[in-house]
Amino acid sequence: MRGQIKILNKFIYVAMIVVVGFTSLGLTSNENEKKIHSNITIENIDVGKLTKKQAIKKLEAKYPLKDFYITWGNEKWAIEAKSIDLDYHIEERVNEAFNYTRDTSMLENIKRKGKLKLKKSHNIRLKATYDEIKLSKELKVICRAINVDAVDASFHVELSGEIKRTKSKEGKKVDLSRLKENIYDMINKKKIENINLPVLTSYPKVSTEQVKSINSILGQFSTSFNDSTSRGSNIHVAGESTSDILLMPGETFSYNKRTGARNWVNGYKSAPIIVGGKVTNGEGGGVCQVSTTIYNAALLSGLTIDEVHNHSLPSKYAPKGRDATVSYGYTDLKFTNPYTHPVYIKNIVGNGAITSKIYGCNLDRERISIRMIEEYTKNKITVQTYRLYLDEENNIVRKEL
């Protein structure tokens, strides 16, 4: 009996809350008036006691969908709001405000109204959206108008020996990530205004000052060959592919990388080569004479030799221990520019000879002498090649193996 009385009391209590809710909170009057409940704000703008139409008008006056400009100096580009589908979704947020005290259960609606009556306001944020793909298309137009690649300075030696230089130029590039970030921040703040175009300066990899520093021949070496043979043809091809190369400070030269595979596709013919201590025919015969010539020029120029291999048989075109055999994919000739200035490799091929010259800054020029020490055993000769650095009185100040 007591349990039934408790249930009845709870029912009466709930019923009283509902009745009080209907009367004291004025549910029916708000519903009939079709207005947003008081103390509801959108983006901290009071829309309470307004119809949806009135609220939309008020918010659109505060947050119009305006076009904006991206400016750079005297240049400017218009970005239309409609072209990027810019939208604050005001109508959706107004509907949310209108339904705040209507779209949940009766008790929850009463609870929300109670808080609003107690001056506890409810704020709804506007969410700005735009089409990123469409914006990117607009920004590409700006980038095409602004972006200019930096131009490297160049250094070239004609066959006549005449030196030609061109100057470097700085480039410019739109900082696209920063520009997009600025637009994103502006739109999210819903404060449409013009944006300054962020432009970065791009610098050339090779400057005018660097090529100006090339004013001297650091070292050179020549070898002879029969110009009228397939081997001679291969020397021409390899000599051209490894010539006119600007090697920046710290940069490494790779013979195999410059020539590529020595096959008929790259212009090489079959000619005598040394394989396993024997002379036979193979594609690219003669390329080792080019690598040997360049190697000796690099030795005399003080460049750092990273990789070099000798033939299994002595070469006719170079002293013992100063040849450089190469085999694509296996053995290579590599050296690095150790100086703070660039060096330039120039090969001159013709009239039965190939000459490799390495140009650089006269401040880097060393007095270098090459010395070979031969060691004879029963079956072979071993040659050790030393690079000697000399002072003005020809005293050895440093030597390298």
Could you say what each language-model-derived stretch is?
Residues 33-272, 277:
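Short glycine/threonine-rich beta-strand-turn micro-motifs
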Residues 2-16:
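N-terminal Sec-pathway targeting helices
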